[in-house]
Amino acid sequence: MENFNELLQKYADFIVRVGVNPQPGQTLIINCPLEGAPLARLCVRSAYEAGARDVQVNWQDDAVTRIRMELGSEDALTDHKGWQLRRYLDYAESEGGVCVLHLIADDPELFAGLDGAKISRVNSANRSFMQPWREYTMNDRVQWSIAALPAEPWAKKMFPELDTAAAIEAQWKLIFDTCRVTGGDPVGEWQKHLDRLNELGAKMNALDLESVHFESANGTDLTVGLAEQAVWESAGSKNEKGVPFLPNIPTEEVFTAPHKDKVDGIVYGTKPYVFNGQLIKNFHVTFKDGKVVEHGADEGADLLGQLLDTDEGARHIGEVALVPASSPINRSGKLFYNTLFDENAACHIAFGDSYPGTTVGGTGLSKEELAARGMNHSSLHEDVMIGAEDSEITGKCRDGRTVPLFENGVWVL
């Protein structure tokens, strides 16, 4: 690819300076697959140049992860040690604090053919063990960001007609394009984009909505009641000290918290979804009083059931997000088989935990106070795509008005 090194440097600088935004004296932890070493090295340098006190890199390898899941005993895989959690909490509680950058290149079918029930139990135990740290990120107490890079299994899944080298190059180009890196001024392009998302969020909040209704020709007919004092958020976030960061790169969504007991109707998935390294395709779920009461899928139905059975909160939703069909990711015409991208190609809901920041003052409330507002709690938060090219979305205001939000899959607000 022409000027690849220049684009990679721009991408690294953007991920660090705008995405995770380490502050002087702060430690940055980078979680990265082995394939991402060139990008990680650029991020390490950029972070130090931004004033980071220290940069720690945790290397990961999908092949080893699969072997451990296949051959390791469940007891061993869930035998957690205190240091695995403390290495995050110790930095978070230190004077300078911590921020975390996740560089991902997940194989969409990493665990294909393995025992799905075992995978679900192991991953559930891992989430529960790391819950104290997860609360730091779910509450935006620290900066965190997720960005992607190509790897052979993922690239070949997206571009099966190409050889490996060409598939990886095509994937890099797509990542650079959808992350707005290929222009002359990525930061300026992103600022315009974030301003537009913030404007939409402000308009949604001004409507004082009670619920939103989704309808499309595939059979979706879903009403999502909103949590009390729900706040529509957009791409950018701030940590507890007011430091801005960008959790997801790319991002196209405006989102809020549903009321966990006020979701009713049926919804059909519009894109495959990867859960525990396996695919769920053409799913549907039916809600009554906020809870999933029936579900199915053409592929991965058992896997969907395992997701929903994770805990009580997994059968309720913690997020509803609006994304137009005109988003650059959807316009690319490619299915990414990766939630970071696919959730930004279509409207989506998330089974599981609510973000406390999507209700007024939520990051300062107790779990009981959040629950009283209708916020959901779960050990997981899994986004599934429900937006279609013909999606019609209307909002019902608390004063009784009905307002069109989307027509034919795009914003009309």
Regions found by a protein language model. Give the residues of each.
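Active-site lining segments that contact anionic ligands and/or coordinate catalytic metals
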Residues: 262-264, 280-282, 289, 315-319, ...
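Extended hydrophobic packing segments that form well-structured cores
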Residues: 368-413
